[in-house]
Amino acid sequence: MWPAGAGTKLPCPRDSALRRAAFSGNLTALPSHLVPAGRSVRVFISANPEDTGAERQALRENVYPKLREFCRENYGLEFQVIDLYWGVEEDEWDSPELQKTRMKLLENCLKTSAGPCFVGLLGEKYGNIRIPGEVEASEFEMILDAAIEAKLETKLLEEWYCRDENSVPAAYYLRPKSEMLRSNRNAMQPSTNAENEKTWQEISDEIKKIFKAAVKLLHEKGKMKHSQAKRYLFSAIEDEFDFALGKQTPAFLKKCVCYIRKIANIERFVKIPEMGKYMDITGTEPRIIRDPEAQEKLIKLRDEFIPTIVASSNLRVYTSVTHCDMKLGYSQEIENHYIEGLGKQFYEDMIDIIQATIQQNFDTETDTLYDEILQHSSLCKTYASFYEYKCESLNIVHNYILPSKAGHINPLIIYGGPCTGKTLLLAEVAKKAYGWLHEDTGPESDPVVIVRFLGTTDMSSDLRTLLLSVCEQLAVNYRCLVQSYPKKIHDLCDLFINLLNESSLQRPLVIIFDALEQLSENDDARKLWWLPAHLPRFVRIVLSTLPNKHGILQKLRCLIHEEDNYIELIPRDRKMCSQVLKHQLLRVKRKVTSGQQIYVNNALSKCTLPMFVNLTFREVRHWRSHKDVDESSLSVTVHESIEQLFWSLEKKCGQKLVSRALGYITMAKMGLSEMELEDVLALDNSVMSELKENTRPSNPLRVPYLYIARLKEGLSGYLIERHVKNVTLLVWANRHLQLIAQKLYLQDDNDLREMHTILADYFLGVWSGGRRKAFCLEDPYLNGCLDLENRSLLEEEKHFMEQASFDRQAPDQPWVFQCNPLEPDIFFVNHRKMSELLYHLTRCGKTDDLLYGIIMNFSWLYTMIKIGQFDKVLSDIELAYNYSQEKELKFLANTLRSIKNKVTAFPGSLSAELQQRLLPVVSSLPKLRHLLLECDKDGPKYCSIVPLHSSMDVTYSPERLPLSSSHLHVTEILPTCNPSTVLTALENGSISTWDVETRQLLRQITTAQSVILGMKLTSDEKYLVVATTNNTLLIYDNVNSCLLSEVEIKGTKHGSSATYINGFTLSANHALAWLEASKDVTVIDLLYGWPLYQFHCWYEVTCVQCSLDGLYAFCGQYLNTTTIFHLGSGEKLCTVTSEFSGGFVKFLLILDTAQEMVMVDSEGSLSVWNTEDISSPQLTDDFDCRREDSEVVSIELSEDQSAVLICKALSIELLDTGLWKVAEKFRAKHNERFISAVLSKNGDCIIATMENTSAVFFWRRDTGQCMASLQEISGSIVKLVKSSHHNMLLSLSTSGVLSIWDIDIITAMSNIDKTGKPIQSLLLPARGEIIYSLDGSDCVHKWNFSSGFIEAVFKHEGIVEHCVLTSTGDIMVTSDDKSSQYVWHTSSGENLFRINGQRISQLLITHNDQFVVSLCEENASRVWRLATGHRVCNILTTLQNAFITSANTFVVGMTKSKVLAVSLWTGSITKKFCCEDGTTIVNFKLIPDCPDIIVFITSAETVNIWSLTDEVICRRVQLPNNFLKNLEDFEISPNGKLGIIARGDENINVLDLYSGKLRVVHASGIIWRQRLSRDGRYLVYICFRNGEEEDENGAIFSLIVMRLADGKNIGACSLYKTPTFLALSQRHLNIIVGFDDGSIGIYTVVDRVDAALKIKIATSNSRQIFNNATHTSRPKCNSYCFKISVDCLWRESTEVFARDSPITVSDSTESNEATPSKKHNSCYERVCSALEARGHSYAPDN
């Protein structure tokens, strides 16, 4: 989780001043917005709402989303547009409240935007002057007098403006419109609303007229200054332009843009009604003219003010002139054309400004410590700004912090109840501490202040991460080099104390921890053992805590005894609070009247907490002098005041909007950003329904920003901004605010689930990219139509659905924002999705999205690991597993743990590492399929190696649970329907229910001192039945663990000896029990818990079994007799006896499907009875097994009742129930005995344990191959129990440890085929998807490339030494150590003919597949015709490492320091090259694309290029001295330009054979094997690391692919077995690696991810396995044997064909001819047809 060596990051000159200030805690040096990259781009749109509606709508629909996407992808920032007119009703545009809010937000945008901040849209309309919301009393009265003087009617002003004495100075304010018009805003009365709007319009026009005339008069007379008159005479747009552009620097103006639209000759169209919105008009019909006064002001603004700004700066201004249609004026078409151009220009300008003003900053993505410090610094500055009380406590802390000369120094503790101001005091201390110390210790000093508000971040909530971050910050400040931080908490604490000692007089240290009670209890953090009681001389620690939480204050008092070290924050007295309130009000120019003060004093007498005073101030500042207040006007507690604050917000913004907005902020894990809040509210239909109650919804459906602004303004100081990972989030400033919000808005479970779902959908990006979400209406029928998952919709319903669905403009939510797809490792992390999505998915029940949207998402895994959050990945997977209980998640977590070292060092290798480990198990764990497909899709961006078939053995360890010190104490183990829950019984009478994964005891029953003989659960797990030595059955309610009844079991009365219960069994409603040596079976009703009746049998009962339907009981007895009873009536139906009557019935099996009963006696004999007529069963089959001397240990019927497994001490038999025959039989080795055996769930595998061994063995049924022998580390296994509900196996060891094995995972091992011996050689035909392997045995194995399974085995008489294939792979020629050669037809497996006589040293086949060259070391080598076996010629020279030239003319080889070219037609040496000066030829190669050019290396360390045609050296390249000392291999590129030389070291030597230059590329380890791709573009090599570097899983070998063009490693993959052979296919770039256990791994290289290669991966069989819903079993492996008879015997220089040989004997002369014999035969034809197929199926090699 922590970047390595964080302590080594020393502040250096290039580090920013911001960073240094943050690390040292100099908060005053930090800007108000701490993180430049953390601010969003906030653009304020200044425009007249009337004439720019279409432009602003088009920009919102088409341009803003694109700009937002651009900013997120390229800078990791939000792009936000503040357009306060959008979505607001027309009658609100003139509202003074709105204008006031606009100016505040404009100022905020100018200050905080990281990029462009202001866009002005100016047309031909100047706009209305504003109605003032509040006017000072003296000014208002002066205006009133002037109006009277001008003979204006002032009644309206007097009616609508009211004097307010609470204002300082007194003022007149505009009364609320709703109050004055007394309108009921009800949608059922639209006429009333329309009338009100009209009335208001008339009134507002009249008020403006009065103000305008009066102010002008006052201004002319000099009674009012221009600056005062401006607010009455200017329109809103001029104010905004003036504020934004008027007094700014040229640098700042680069971030602003103006778009001016002029309409030519607009005055001509003044009478067209629609043109009224594009210009200011005056007069009435028919004398309507353009308002000359407004036009004059517009010209002044547009043609004078703006050009003046442009002249002195680089302000971007675009002016467009549009011409009206002669009839229609400024028509829709003309406007659309203008809007289209504006949109393009707006987008380009924003991009330009963003790129010019914002720097991409990727550093903060990985610097976790810096981000943590900034979060706390940001909070500190925010909290300190709310600090109001200048109390004595601050002085005490000030004095404590200053360095003293002597005496013990202890931490200082500040404590007090909730809302007493502890956090604000500590924030103020943290803010001032640096300055205090600097002042006290001199200007040369450099103090360090570390502040943490515990519990506000993940890292400050846990002791381990808290100490780690503080230690890292100390190490950076005091320049301490910490190589690695301790893992153990006590070592970390020691490091913390050691780092405290680094402080000095010049560098004093202050550490501030607020809210100790917020620390989690992990590592006993709340016991405070980690807190140093005695501090170094220059260290001060200030702590705060609640007095009664977790006993922390009490523990502190035990640690620190001096009372002087404790400061209690107690409530202030009423007078002081009243004084504070008075000052707060005066700051905002308000006061309370003497009448109101009584109620304020009354409230303060009941509560004087700082927060209550602040809440009271919030309420009182809105009081008006003429409004009545009483005792109920003010709350008397903090909680009530907060509730009152929220309710007042609901009135202002709407109940649903406030409840949902505050609910979302409260429920979000880390808070929400402003943009996220906007997005989420837009997705909430209940909010949008409230907002759109009276208006028709339209695209895009969004919440008008005005509501967000009002919400933030109403909660300013309580809803604060906090910087987390470059994002500014809205969070509660106080835990009490959060509690009240939770209580008010997050109580209803349905609402909670719906809100979590909306947040989850938002972070999943469900509604991004313009996807429309249905806007649910109240009509249930319409809602039914809108159900997207509904039946196939009718056309009209579809049309309605489209009409009623709207784009909410939710942004896309990838895990990372990538600015360049070609550089996948340069990105910004979507931290918001990382921190929020999992949290909400687990709370809204979206399991599939949790699994596939996060945990099985490769992009999430890769990103988390890349940014160093590996441990967070594991904790998130664990959380998802606890929630979903999917075992795939558990396996994935274990898999990730095992590859941790590799993927944290090389994150790019994640996909290949995962694919290797998941491919073998995906058929058993199908949910991992999604992750594998994700790896295929996204993995090749980072690693070009894609495993197609993995041979990796599955590593698996079971869950273990210690039950007792010995197995002798454990009497019974029962699995349950919950895979992680088991029941165990001990002989002491205790029955425990365990959760195996957590090792927790869930519940326990004690059976009153009696020893337990056994226990069973009913099939529905409702009842638990326990047999005891008291001869009683105890019946328990299994769910509640309570005893329901106790029933005594009585048997046949004979003799006086004591007998115990011999056994019992359960049906659905009954328990059946019998005593030792008893002929009676007692039947008990489980529901009522009493005995019903006894079954009386002929002989002593040995076993009882019930039918599946619970109707019949089958009682097995001595003398192999079974009696059948009716369970319902107790009636005896019949008795049957087997003729093998030597023993007793040990087991009974009931096959319901076949209506059969199977009796198994103690000696293993079987009798099968047909029970179709239950009263008269008929014997159908029997087996007498008395000859075998081993007893039956266990027996099992397979789940599908198709097989019976009989485990005896010395053998395991599997019977087919269809034929009643032994299908398979496995015998134990000498001196071994079976304890138990079971079948896997699907019956494919047999699992068994042996006596005195600690291993569980797994056999494959079809092959008998032992797939695995898994060791149980806790001791020898004495018992196996199989779960009937899950594919789980329980084993008990001698040490009393219970292990739970997942058979699904273990049977996955059968997905890997092995030959059993190290692979020595691999052959691939030029075309076709087959691989052949040689492993030093007498077999050649044929592998299917797509599946990775062995298809066939070709057996030979001796050990196979050589093998060659035709290009299609249809014919194979092999030779063995018995001097035999074999020609095989690979499809049919037929050995076509066999040649004996000479031991072969090398086999070669010509490129046209016609001839074979058999090279011998002792006798003459031969060239023979493949079709007939006839000799073409003899080669008398011994050749080594030979090749056939591509023209099929020569065989070229080495002999005694010579390179010889021998003719394939005559066998004579045609060309040769001899070394001079006694040098020898070390190695040679043919150049693939140049058939007659040979490259060889000599011992003189020269590389020679020899032309076979001209017999001359074309080129000679000298290598460095001693270069060939360790030569292992060399490869030549197809064009002969490059040579790759391996020397067994860590270097790849690339030799340019044209220029002679040698380039050395460092490899990832010591190179073991290398291969050049057929096209010469890639080098594939396997390297190994020294044993010291071996990782946990023993992966010391790595497979690497290097691109030769740039020397870059494009893929790496660990090999977890020892490789023995490396081969590449000729077509594509497929890699096949042979391993020492006889398995092979198949990989492909995907360098550029194109469609064809994606299809190639998707169609490989390893992917098809898990694509098919019904997974068919693997094809059977065929075994083909060699011919016993020899067809041809080679002598010295002749061949002798056998009489019965399929090869036709011909003249010796014919053997030299190039044409084949005319005497055809069947064998000849088969070979020929196979060879001809080559011509028909030929396709160019890729």
From Swiss-Prot:
The UniProt entry's coiled-coil ranges are none
The Gene Ontology CC terms held by the record are:
synapse
Name the PANTHER family on file. BETA TRANSDUCIN-RELATED PROTEIN, NACHT AND WD REPEAT DOMAIN-CONTAINING PROTEIN 2
Q: Which InterPro entries match?
A: Beta-prop_NWD2_C (IPR056534), NACHT-WD_repeat (IPR052752), P-loop_NTPase (IPR027417), WD40/YVTN_repeat-like_dom_sf (IPR015943), WD40_repeat_dom_sf (IPR036322), WD40_rpt (IPR001680)
Residue span, NACHT domain = 410-737
Gene from which the chain derives? NWD2
What is the designated name of this protein?
NACHT and WD repeat domain-containing protein 2
Question: A Pfam family name for this chain?
Answer: HTH_NWD1
Record keywords, A-Z: Leucine-rich repeat, Repeat, WD repeat
WD-type repeats, residues: 963-1004, 1007-1046, 1140-1179, 1229-1271, 1272-1311, 1314-1353, 1355-1394, 1396-1434, 1476-1516, 1522-1564, 1614-1653
The segments carrying the LRR repeats are 386-410, 677-698, 724-747, 883-906, 925-953
Q: Does the keyword Repeat apply?
A: yes
PROSITE patterns assigned: WD_REPEATS_1, WD_REPEATS_REGION
